[in-house]
Regions:
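Bacterial N-terminal signal peptides that target proteins for export
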Residues: 4-26
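Pocket-lining segment of extracytoplasmic ligand-binding domains
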Residues: 203-299
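Bacterial signal peptide processing site
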Residues: 39-41
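Secondary-structure end/capping motifs
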Residues: 261-344
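Conserved C-terminal helix/tail region of periplasmic/extracytoplasmic solute-binding proteins
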Residues: 333-375
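Short, glycine-/small- and polar/acidic-enriched structural segments
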Residues: 44-201, 206-210, 214-218, 237, ...
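C-terminal motif of bacterial Sec signal peptides marking the signal peptidase cleavage site
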Residues: 32-37
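Sec/Tat-exported extracytoplasmic proteins
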Residues: 87-91, 95-96, 119, 124-127, ...
Length: 375
């Protein structure tokens, strides 16, 4: 297995996966619900009046303020930047959704706990394995969209590491927990993970070239770009090069709350899908929306690289006949097996209650998001 040098991921190609039949009847029902929408200009042009019928609007308003907690501050990651852009563009408002965005600290399980408790309503998880792990910790969350179908977690080492087994007896830094795809990669490579000292290393990747640690987990859209900007040398190890499956950019919500407010969940995902399409063509504009929220200063150039890297990975791992965010439980099961293989799980739980594609499928016809007023 050859590692990737200096953060340049291989070209992604669409995965040859079985087609999940879309819920066309649900999508047609959505069209019917929106049939009375007014024929105004698109929300990107600044319209604020509701574009859905009164009954649906009232249903959405009854949910009150909807809190979205970001994964990590206002970073331009998939499943995060689109929400920021949807709010800035007025897309939520046109669907009668009152969305409040709160910055997260990078504590995935902490965010899951907030959603499970009903303190927050939506949050991104790093991958589908984290949805499983959260529920194993009694944080009741459900994955409603998975945007990336390749591991985004990566392992960076100093260049003198020729084999992953060289890390035995060394120190590995992570942000809050060892990502499941990275742990699975280490196990697949024959590493005795128990011999590696694991520490929380924070979010400054310069600890790696300063030799404070010998390996660092991260996101291929983030830390490699940061180290490249510092002109530092490193070796990047990608889980898929070791046969490890994975995902990223998973939108999560509270399952009980979602059943109480199905139109809210549908229209939240509708606005996010609309924003993704817009931001794919207008990355600088959308990153600018995130910059406006960050009072501590914002590296616009770096965050544009984060967004471009992740949206390309989404496109490369989504088959042409699937919607962005599709859920394939066969792939989910393969990812969950990595948790079992690494000892994180004794057995793989029933995954169907943990992932629900109905809300995403209800707002799409074929691969296109249904938006009121569009021809």
């Amino acid at each position: 297995m050859n590692p990737t040098e200096n953060g340049k991921p291989p070209t992604m190609t669409p995965l040859n996966r079985p087609i999940r039949p879309g819920l066309l009847s649900a999508a047609l029902l959505t069209v019917a619900l929106l049939a009375s929408a007014c024929g105004q200009e698109t929300p990107e042009q600044g319209a604020s009046a509701a574009v859905i019928d009164n009954d649906r609007c009232m249903d959405n308003q009854r949910a009150g303020t909807i809190t979205f907690v970001t994964g990590y501050h206002y970073q331009a990651s998939v499943s995060q930047l689109e929400v920021i852009a949807a709010e800035a563009m007025g897309l939520f408002e046109t669907l009668c959704l009152d969305v409040e965005i709160q910055p997260g600290s990078g504590d995935v399980m902490g965010n899951a706990q907030l959603v499970s408790a009903g303190t927050a309503h939506f949050t991104p998880a790093g991958n589908e394995a984290e949805i499983v792990q959260a529920n194993e910790r009694d944080h009741e969350v459900v994955g409603i969209a998975t945007y990336g179908h390749v591991p985004i977690s990566t392992l960076l080492t100093q260049q003198n590491v020729e084999h992953l087994t060289d890390l035995e007896g060394q120190t590995l830094g992570h942000q809050s927990m060892l990502p499941a795809p990275v742990e699975a990669m280490l196990v697949e490579a024959g590493v005795d993970v128990d011999t590696i000292e694991q520490v929380e290393a924070g979010y400054d990747p310069s600890v790696l070239p300063r030799d404070q640690i010998q390996a660092l987990t991260g996101f291929r859209s983030n830390e490699p770009h940061q180290l490249d900007a510092m002109d530092e040398k490193y070796t990047e190890w990608l889980p898929e090069d070791f046969g490890v499956v994975g995902s990223f950019g998973v939108m999560a919500t509270n399952p009980e709350w979602a059943e109480e407010h199905p139109t809210v969940v549908e229209d939240f995902l509708r606005a996010v899908a609309r924003a993704f399409d817009h931001c794919s063509e207008n990355g600088e504009e959308c990153v600018g929306y995130a910059a406006e929220l960050d009072e501590a200063g914002y590296d616009t150039e770096h965050n544009l690289k984060v967004w471009d890297t992740e949206r390309e990975l989404v496109g490369g791992s989504t088959p042409d006949d699937q919607v962005n965010g599709y859920i394939d439980l066969t792939m989910t099961a393969e990812e969950a097996e990595t948790l079992k293989d690494s000892g994180e799980l004794d057995s793989v739980p029933d995954l169907e209650p943990l992932f629900d594609p109905r809300f995403l499928e209800a707002v799409h016809v074929a691969t296109e998001v249904v938006w009121p007023g569009d021809e």
